[in-house]
Amino acid sequence: MGFAKQFFFLAVLLSAAVMCSMAEPAQERLIESIACIQKGLPCMEHSDCCRGVCEALFCQ
């Protein structure tokens, strides 16, 4: 009985770790799509802009 509980606990921990590692990239993409900067506003990198073009510190 003790081994079965330990095995079940290990399986739950492993599946939780896998689910968290798969969810992080999706969460990052969602945040980037919500938090992107509109055309004409200041930016620092191409990834800051909704269309991905940052020229002369402004989204194009």
From Swiss-Prot:
Coiled-coil parts of chain: none
Role: Probable insect neurotoxin with ion channel impairing activity. Does not show activity on 45 human receptors from 9 families (5-hydroxytryptamine, adrenergic, dopamine, muscarinic, histamine, neurotransmitter, opioid, sigma, and gaba(A) receptors). In vivo, does not cause paralytic or lethal activity when injected into sheep blowflies. When mixed with U3-SYTX-Sth1h does not cause paralytic or lethal activity when injected into crickets. It is noteworthy that both sheep blowflies and crickets are evolutionarily distant from prey species.
Note on domains (UniProt): The presence of a 'disulfide through disulfide knot' structurally defines this protein as a knottin.
Protein name in the entry: U3-scytotoxin-Sth1a
Any one GO CC term of the record: extracellular region
Gene Ontology MF terms: ion channel regulator activity; toxin activity
Keyword annotations from UniProtKB, A to Z: Disulfide bond, Ion channel impairing toxin, Knottin, Neurotoxin, Secreted, Signal, Toxin
Propeptide stretch(es), residue numbers: 24-29
Tissue expression: Expressed by the venom gland.
Organism whose genome encodes this protein: Scytodes thoracica
Places the protein is found: Secreted
Secretion signal span: 1-23
Disulfide linkage: 36-50, 43-54, 49-59
